[in-house]
């Protein structure tokens, strides 16, 4: 099965002068203190879930966790299993039961301290409600993960996030799906559940930077509930899918049938998003073409000072993406371009179709078993949203992130990352768009076990 999720989340992840405004480093002392801790703290020995199941090192599948190597990509394409997977199941004498000897569980924990240039500003009034030049973002995320084969052709995966970005007291399932690698002997693979549409291109969870692939978030092609079918066709791989199009945060009671009925709606309309990707290797380069058509809520009435409210209309959107990547086992290069068209989107100009473009390019260099270095350049152009006095002027992005990771162990690393914002601040009278710089300096730890 050429599973489109080219990642291993149980071992992974996944936010100057006139031009480069100086970081506000009022908390530089604690930051330096944490760096000292990172450089001199003892490493912790731990074995992530897939490594634990098969008794292998994380380096079998990862060039540097969570970045996959070629073996790791093949492991994912083989429906998240090795040929010896049955050696790790209970011998019950029942040919129709394949239970793991133990429930396969893993944890990923991230803890940071971070200096910020951005703050929490009300786009309607310009009031700064929350402003911290540095803080302890710890834990930044705790993620519980599990995955295993259930039969010769069926596997499952889920990931539950606890305390993501300070949301303490919550448990949120971001990925949860069941996959089949050969439906009815057709060679067609299927994934049913909720997952990220953008994983067809570059899984956000396997990036080495703390900074995100911003274009995916702004285009709305991350988490959805749906189904994906995929198949190899000669040298190419084709993936097609359908999703609800309303994310994974909300469900709706189906109370029309009577009092306190158990049925629940996971979508609030009949429109669905249709998406797909065709990919192929051209020499050493992996490339693909992505497309999506679907619906989204309109951008509502423009309130005083430019604050944009959520609209009530359903409007059409289309996304076209081109992705390319390649590596030699030590240097990994990747790039993504997205073209977005949002038809009749703004309620104050409902007859106008608007478009914007965005993407990123990046490089990961595995210098040694201990050190990796990464660059990630995010760029987006608001185009037709420029001058609309709406929050969508904030699509405009121009940042460069530089990251160094030190591996205490295969599965425990320290990270230092600086994000440089090259987008000029918007000094117009409204309070939307790029009102402050978004640079930061981040230090922390990332561990999977």
Label each region the model flagged.
Residues 85-106:
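Short Fe-S-cluster ligation motifs
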Residues 55-65:
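The canonical Cys-X-X-Cys-His
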């Amino acid at each position: 099965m050429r599973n489109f999720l080219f990642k291993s989340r149980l071992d992974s992840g996944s936010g100057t002068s006139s031009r480069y405004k100086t970081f506000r480093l009022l908390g530089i002392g604690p930051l330096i203190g944490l760096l000292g801790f990172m450089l001199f703290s003892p490493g912790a020995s731990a074995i992530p879930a897939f490594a634990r199941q098969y008794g292998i090192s994380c380096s079998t599948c990862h060039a540097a966790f969570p970045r996959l190597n070629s073996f790791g990509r093949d492991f994912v394409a083989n429906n998240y299993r090795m040929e010896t997977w049955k050696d790790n199941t209970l011998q019950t004498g029942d040919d129709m039961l394949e239970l793991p000897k133990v429930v396969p569980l893993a944890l990923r924990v991230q803890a940071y301290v971070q200096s910020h240039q951005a703050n929490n500003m009300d786009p309607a009034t310009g009031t700064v409600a929350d402003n911290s030049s540095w803080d302890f973002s710890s834990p930044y995320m705790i993620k519980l993960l599990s995955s295993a084969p259930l039969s010769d052709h069926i596997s499952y995966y889920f990931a539950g996030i606890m305390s993501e970005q300070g949301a303490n007291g919550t448990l949120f399932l971001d990925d949860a799906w069941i996959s089949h690698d050969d439906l009815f002997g057709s060679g067609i693979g299927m994934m049913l559940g909720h997952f990220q549409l953008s994983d067809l291109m570059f899984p956000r969870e396997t990036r080495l930077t703390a900074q995100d692939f911003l274009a995916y978030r702004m285009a709305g092609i991350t988490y959805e509930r749906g189904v994906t079918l995929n198949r190899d066709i000669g040298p190419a791989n084709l993936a097609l899918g359908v999703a609800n199009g309303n994310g994974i945060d909300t469900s709706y009671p189906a109370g029309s049938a009577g009092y306190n009925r158990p049925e629940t709606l996971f979508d609030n309309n009949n429109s669905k998003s249709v998406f797909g990707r065709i990919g192929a290797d051209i020499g050493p380069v992996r490339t693909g073409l992505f497309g999506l058509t679907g619906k989204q809520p309109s951008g509502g009435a423009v309130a005083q000072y430019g604050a944009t409210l959520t609209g009530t209309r359903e409007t059409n959107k289309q996304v076209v993406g081109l992705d390319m990547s390649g590596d030699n086992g030590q240097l990994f290069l990747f790039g993504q371009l997205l073209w977005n068209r949002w038809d009749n989107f703004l309620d104050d100009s409902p007859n106008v179709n608007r478009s914007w473009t965005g993407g990123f390019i990046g490089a990961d260099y595995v210098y040694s078993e201990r050190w990796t270095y990464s660059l990630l350049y995010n760029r987006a152009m608001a185009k037709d949203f420029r001058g609309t006095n709406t929050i969508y002027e904030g699509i405009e992005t121009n940042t460069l992130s530089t990251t160094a990771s030190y591996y205490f162990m295969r599965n425990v690393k320290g990270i230092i990352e600086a994000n440089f914002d090259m987008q000029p601040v918007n000094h117009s009278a409204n309070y939307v768009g790029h009102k402050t710089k978004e640079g930061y300096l981040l230090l922390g730890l990332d561990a999977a076990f």
